[in-house]
Amino acid sequence: MARQKKMGQNVLRAVFFLVLGLLGHSHGGFPNTISIGGLFMRNTVQEHSAFRFAVQLYNTNQNTTEKPFHLNYHVDHLDSSNSFSVTNAFCSQFSRGVYAIFGFYDQMSMNTLTSFCGALHTSFVTPSFPTDADVQFVIQMRPALKGAILSLLGHYKWEKFVYLYDTERGFSILQAIMEAAVQNNWQVTARSVGNIKDVQEFRRIIEEMDRRQEKRYLIDCEVERINTILEQVVILGKHSRGYHYMLANLGFTDILLERVMHGGANITGFQIVNNENPMVQQFIQRWVRLDEREFPEAKNAPLKYTSALTHDAILVIAEAFRYLRRQRVDVSRRGSAGDCLANPAVPWSQGIDIERALKMVQVQGMTGNIQFDTYGRRTNYTIDVYEMKVSGSRKAGYWNEYERFVPFSDQQISNDSASSENRTIVVTTILESPYVMYKKNHEQLEGNERYEGYCVDLAYEIAKHVRIKYKLSIVGDGKYGARDPETKIWNGMVGELVYGRADIAVAPLTITLVREEVIDFSKPFMSLGISIMIKKPQKSKPGVFSFLDPLAYEIWMCIVFASIGVSVVLFLVSRFSPYEWHLEDNNEEPRDPQSPPDPPNEFGIFNSLWFSLGAFMQQGCDISPRSLSGRIVGGVWWFFTLIIISSYTANLAAFLTVERMVSPIESAEDLAKQTEIAYGTLDSGSTKEFFRRSKIAVYEKMWSYMKSAEPSVFTKTTADGVARVRKSKGKFAFLLESTMNEYIEQRKPCDTMKVGGNLDSKGYGVATPKGSALGNAVNLAVLKLNEQGLLDKLKNKWWYDKGECGTGGCGSKDKTSALSLSNVAGVFYILVGGLGLAMMVALIEFCYKSRAESKRMKLTKNTQNFKPAPATNTQNYATYREGYNVYGTESVKI
């Protein structure tokens, strides 16, 4: 009896627990476990990890105030390009009896999935791009960007830009932009980049747009494609100041912007995940501690915004079923879930209740406030607007449906001109004599007082005119500014301006096209050109016959022939002119018949040569022409010798008192033709860029040599180049700006010199960042200083007044000095030679005369022994005398 009573109590207890279990299983028909589906594509690895982790977080952090239910999931992977794979994946989920499906779609799979959901009343929660179509049972976690984009386009006043869009994301934004373009007269160039596989095609598009002078781009793509486009932007160097890129993507911090930010371009984007949100911070703290093997792309990869949307989707699903549980809605699925391919389709009866509950959810997630309209689209959300600066990304404002775009107060970046009086302007410069130098006692000084030089004075004058406070900052890498061909990053002073580390550059910075593209220049404050510096050659030793140098050897030969010609003409004129003949004087006493008669004409051939030589030497002669014709010859010869001797005397003083240096090269052509003397330029400067870009044959040949020379002919600094010139013993030439060349030529040890003319013509300018309001004020200040003549005064002060080589010192190739024996040695040689020749001729004359006199004495003795009869025929004697005069063999009296 007792046993039967005990058995009855056990049965009642079993029935009680059975009823209790049934009540527990169905709180108003609500199950303990909610099964949800997951559809993932290939490139959603991190999103899959976030999906599983979010479910795990919910199951381990349930609200104890309500009867808990667990979330369970079934995951399928689909190939969006295969419609059978998409259908099979969805039907697999539906056959498992899932209450809702989370998943991704693209342009190819969207219609298939949404059609199944609408036909079978199965809710599909997705973080994929939103659609404008009014589809049922699709809950879109991703907010629409159309309104935010149009607001920013109006805020930045874009009237001409390029729109690069992904066709997989739909055409809704394209349509909205084109409608706005018609209303606002915008010039929009739209290009679809969704189907581009070759990265070279992106490059060609950017190059084409750049030829059209396009500087503004709106890029509407997923993160991966945006990264690819920006990579080509960096390669082409289109990420410098003046370019503006607006990224129509909700994951601004997911995009790789490290390389782009160094270019100076303005980059604007949108961010749906607020990293300052405590929920986000708490999630990330747990996220980074996950096991990478169980949750791929969790620990070592930053959290994507699509992963945050995935987490929020689980919150929405959980909140919807909590609501259904509170409302005691029966959502239990009993029996078979049915066939998704049945014809006609058999929808799930509780699907409408679940869809309605999902759309009624309002919860705070990692992406902010989450609400939906009647079509399952996000509403009442806020999107942060970010801007990328050289210092990093910053939040510039926010956008919502009611206030539109709201910029933060500090986003109104100070116009340099408006705030310049209240802040200290950073003036970047470079240590380069005589532009900027340390003072001798600079260690005892502070601030700008430590420096001196041309640019130091120029910066002071500009600041005085513009009325700004400034501090000088020496560029860290010691370079003027060039863009790296691989990274496209600017270095030197140009980089300081491009990346916002300086406000003005006052330095010997050459105005070039590539620099003008990224920074602004004032009018040139100094004109110059590329010049050649060589080591000053040794002074040439004067030759023995250097006194002949004032006249070319051709002139000396002409003078010799002219003298001979004049002598011959004078001889002939004297022969034919009757006024050059002497008349016989009958009153004279008869001479010795043995002595030769006096010649009646003094200008024989030897006397004519003597006359021309005496006139040329400006010493005169004891005979002169008597006839008019002879005097004409003498007059023109005297005039000729006057001009020649005067010119010779004028040049002789310069040639004998000036020491000349023979330069091995005189021009760039000389450098290009030879191989003994190496030549190079400053590395990373405008001079090197000039040769690299030049199309002139001579300069192309020089560039080909310089870039292949071993060891390298490029120097890091100008001082290194000058030192190399001085140590090379004339075997290295340095190509640099003419102003620097002239300055170094005036500095000790005065052993360099500038040769040839300038290879080009350019100027130094004061540089400011692109678009800086300081640019106009600085430009006006430079023009005013030029008109006042202050720029010339500064150059004279630092180039010549402080020169160390004297007036004209090292800057002159010729140096006047006292004559040395070597200058006039040839004259002494000729004197000694002439004296020796005279003594030799005198000896010959003496010997000849002695021999002739001996013969005459013998003849006289013979004559005395034989006395012939006196001459009776005087007529014959006269005839003899006349013939002697005409054909006489002697022209000089003895």
Curated annotation (Swiss-Prot):
Residue numbers bearing the Phosphotyrosine modification: 877, 887
SMART domains in UniProt: Lig_chan-Glu_bd, PBPe
Glycan attachment points: 63, 266, 380, 415, 422
Localisation per UniProt entry: Cell membrane; Postsynaptic cell membrane; Postsynaptic density membrane
Protein name, as recorded: Glutamate receptor 3
Transmembrane segments: 553-573, 628-648, 824-844
Gene coding for it: GRIA3
Source organism: Macaca fascicularis (Crab-eating macaque)
GO terms, molecular function: AMPA glutamate receptor activity; glutamate-gated calcium ion channel activity; glutamate-gated receptor activity
Sites of S-palmitoyl cysteine lipidation: 621, 847
UniProt keyword annotations, A-Z: Cell membrane, Disulfide bond, Glycoprotein, Ion channel, Ion transport, Ligand-gated ion channel, Lipoprotein, Membrane, Palmitate, Phosphoprotein, Postsynaptic cell membrane, Receptor, Signal, Synapse, Transmembrane, Transmembrane helix, Transport
